[in-house]
């Protein structure tokens, strides 16, 4: 994983010089080399600027970052050790950069400092906001002399590297491992810290081995780890959120753009640099990489929408990340060939195929987030549904994604939760509720779970109701759907239908409940005026009870409850289709 991220950073030229980090500058204090006491404030933008950074040393009371630092350090209300360190660094930089010397000189003038504070207050620059300097319109962090000076100056303030050489886990080269790896940013929305989270962290004795301390337990070079950080920072920034996790994905190489129908499809917004005022990159390699990401994103989209993805000759990498206690939690890491991924996605879409709940073709495609909602208990007008997904589904979502992308088995929790969703939705006594059938997307979870976890299901479990299915529980569900339809035909204005009253008990103990429903059916059939429908329902019940067999199951386990739900669902859809076909036939004859 680390090596793949490093390769991504090298390919995109994302790695920064040693000791550099990307920062956002809120405001620039502008000076003039020609006009004394000239002070203006120029507001920054949201772009992250590569700047020198001394890392954890800046967390102490004596040292600070240089060039770009918080207002409380650069322009303090009272002089302190950190502000003195900042100004002294400008003095030393001033030996090779005249603009830095001018800034250091101005910062030693108390009258000008008061003027600067007033300007900062007017522009509402807070003590925690990062600021920097401009001289005659030149930004100090863009100085051509800064990098070479920084390499030498940094060696004087950084503690000497101790320890033996060790092979870097990322590159394999011998290196003196960094004591503390840089933090990864962008996970705040999924439980991380605003200041970043540690990907490699050995701050507790229990995490260490063989007497090694800190990051020496996972030795990485400063340059290689900086590249990994740059790659993750970029990938995380535009990664979608799924159940409280960042869905990060990338590919190992470019693909040919020729005859690429997916080039303009861009799920995460790449390829729009020209629309943001930046010069568009005409380099073939960059365009191919955009094409690869576009095609790759379309693959992920196909998981959600059911569309077919095109061929891509590349290796995919997928990370599910969240932040916990200041650390990066890798929930799942997947990699593999794209052709295999495409086959598994096609299998996923085939397994999902299920009749529409009201016989209007097959169920419509649904985004993966919408499907995952069917694994939560139903709550009407739930405004915190996504918070619930983050809390309740973060544990099984990685396993679900692995099953989708790898073509494997689904966790049993999927079937348990889908059944719970169906029951909870039926129990909502809502006068405005018009759904008589079960939720189609929840039943799709049950169908896929049965197909993948029980091999004998594949032969008999189809998109539509199968009258020859060998499982009695399947036909028990179909029988209940018929009883419910008979009740609806006899008493269309009833407030609580049969499914709402008896479904939860019938799916667990069908032998106890179906007998009672059969007795009620006699009363309901007598209320139906049309002999045609009476005979139709009797014939349906006779066929279904013949399929159940001589003994109705006493209790149903998880597998058979899933069959029960699908039998109910598919029989209801079948009756709806038969009714629509009859109406259409009567219209044609008329």
Language model regions located:
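Residues immediately within or flanking Cys/His clusters that coordinate Zn2+
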Residues: 162-165, 196
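Short cysteine-rich clusters marking metal-coordination/redox-active sites
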Residues: 165-173
């Amino acid at each position: 994983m680390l090596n793949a991220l490093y390769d991504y950073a090298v390919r995109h030229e994302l790695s920064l010089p040693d000791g550099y980090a990307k920062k956002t500058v809120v405001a620039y204090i502008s000076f003039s080399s020609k006009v004394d006491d000239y002070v203006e404030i120029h507001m920054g933008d949201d772009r992250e600027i590569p700047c020198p950074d001394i890392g954890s040393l800046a967390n102490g009371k004596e040292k600070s970052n240089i060039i770009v630092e918080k207002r409380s350090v650069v322009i303090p209300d009272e002089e302190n050790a950190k502000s003195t360190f900042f100004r002294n660094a400008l003095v030393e930089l001033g030996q090779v950069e005249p603009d830095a010397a001018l800034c250091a000189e101005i910062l030693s003038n108390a009258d000008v400092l008061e003027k600067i504070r007033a300007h900062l207050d007017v522009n509402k620059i807070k003590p925690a906001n990062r600021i920097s300097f401009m001289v005659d319109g030149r930004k100090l962090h863009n100085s051509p002399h800064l990098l070479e000076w920084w390499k030498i100056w940094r060696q004087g303030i950084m503690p000497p590297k101790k320890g033996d050489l060790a092979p870097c886990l990322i590159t394999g080269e011998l290196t003196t491992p960094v004591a503390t790896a840089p933090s990864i940013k962008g996970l705040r929305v999924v439980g991380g810290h605003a200041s970043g989270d540690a990907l490699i962290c050995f701050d507790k004795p229990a995490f260490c081995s063989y007497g090694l301390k800190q990051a020496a337990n996972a030795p990485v070079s400063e340059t290689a780890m900086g590249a990994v950080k740059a790659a993750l920072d970029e990938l995380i920034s535009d990664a979608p959120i799924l159940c409280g996790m960042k869905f990060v994905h990338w590919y190992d190489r470019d693909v040919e753009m020729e005859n690429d129908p997916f080039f303009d499809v861009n799920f995460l917004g790449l390829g729009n640099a020209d629309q943001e005022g930046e010069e568009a990159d005409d380099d073939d390699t960059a365009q191919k990489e955009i094409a690869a990401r576009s095609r790759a994103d379309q693959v992920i989209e196909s998981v959600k929408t059911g569309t077919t993805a095109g061929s891509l000759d590349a290796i995919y990498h997928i990370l599910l990340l969240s932040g916990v206690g200041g650390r990066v939690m890798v929930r799942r890491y997947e990699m593999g060939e794209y052709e295999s991924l495409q086959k598994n996605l096609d299998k996923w879409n085939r397994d999902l195929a299920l009749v529409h709940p009201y016989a209007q073709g097959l169920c419509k495609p649904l985004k993966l987030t919408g499907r995952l909602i069917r694994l939560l208990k139903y709550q009407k007008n739930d405004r915190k549904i996504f918070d619930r997904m983050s809390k309740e589904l973060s544990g099984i979502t990685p396993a679900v994604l692995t099953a989708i992308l790898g073509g494997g088995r689904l966790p049993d929790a999927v079937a348990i939760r889908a059944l719970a969703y169906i029951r909870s939705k039926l129990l909502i006594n809502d006068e405005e509720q018009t759904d008589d059938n079960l939720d189609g997307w929840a039943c799709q979870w049950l169908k896929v779970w049965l197909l993948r976890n029980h091999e004998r299901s594949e032969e008999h479990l189809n998109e539509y109701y199968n009258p020859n299915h060998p499982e009695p529980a399947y036909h028990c569900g179909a029988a209940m759907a018929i009883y419910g339809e008979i009740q609806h035909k006899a008493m269309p204005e009833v407030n609580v239908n049969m499914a709402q009253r008896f479904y939860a008990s019938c799916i667990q103990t069908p032998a106890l409940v179906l007998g009672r429903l059969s007795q009620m059916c006699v009363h309901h059939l007598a209320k139906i005026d049309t002999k045609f429908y009476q005979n139709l329902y009797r014939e349906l019940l006779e066929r279904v009870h013949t399929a159940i067999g001589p003994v109705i199951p006493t209790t149903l386990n998880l597998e058979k409850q899933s069959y029960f739900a699908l039998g109910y669902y598919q029989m209801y859809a079948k009756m709806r289709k038969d009714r629509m076909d009859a109406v259409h036939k009567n219209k044609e004859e008329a």
